[in-house]
Every structure is written in structure tokens, then in C-alpha cells.
Regions:
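Asp-box/BNR beta-propeller blade signature and adjacent active/binding-site loops
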Residues: 1-104
Length: 104
């Protein structure tokens, strides 16, 4: 049986390619971002928890394929109680309406 090989690209040393979405502090960890690239290939959304897995979820938007990011966007009040790492998905329903879903 052949093992599946998934190609990887390591850009960890190419710091000129790194983009800061949100700067944490020594007391506030901000990690586990999930991004979604929209079909126009320039609009992106990013969701991430405050702290290590919550509480609360932050949503930001980029209009230039992730080079720059908006300030945190308004989110529903119940996102303040999220206690996990969120993920964001795009679905187009049978009614052809595009919807974004955030799960945590």
C-alpha cells in the first residue's frame, strides 16, 4: 500500500510573508485563527478565540487577500460565551443565497 504524501511549504523563516492579524500580549494569548477565502479571491474572513480556546470569538475581514485586516467586527452577543476554537465556512443554499457559518 502506498502512503499518501501531502506536499507542504514551510514559510516559517520567510518573515516578510508573515501578516499579523491580532497582536496578543504577554498576558493575552491570541491564536488558533481560521480563515475563509471568498470566491472573489481577495475578501477573507478570520475568526479566532480570545485566549486559548475562548472565551469569546473575534471576527475580522480583509479586502486584500489577507495583507491587511479590519478592526474586530460586530458579532452576536452569544459569541461572548464561546469556549472553543471557532471555524468559519461558506455555504450556498438551494435558494442560491450565500451564508457564512461560524462553529465553535
Amino acid at each position: 500500500m502506498n502512503a499518501l504524501r501531502i506536499p507542504t511549504i514551510d514559510v516559517s523563516e520567510e518573515t516578510e510573508r508573515h501578516v499579523m492579524i491580532s497582536q496578543g500580549t504577554s498576558d493575552e494569548y491570541q491564536g488558533h485563527p481560521t480563515t475563509l477565502l471568498m470566491p472573489d479571491i481577495t475578501t477573507m474572513f478570520c475568526v479566532y478565540p480570545l485566549g486559548h480556546g475562548g472565551p469569546a470569538v473575534v471576527l475580522r475581514r480583509s479586502e486584500d487577500a489577507g495583507l491587511t485586516w479590519s478592526a474586530p467586527l460586530p458579532v452576536p452577543d452569544n459569541w461572548a460565551t464561546a469556549n472553543n476554537c471557532p471555524a468559519i465556512f461558506r455555504f450556498v443554499g438551494p435558494d442560491s443565497i450565500e451564508r457564512l457559518f461560524v462553529y465553535e
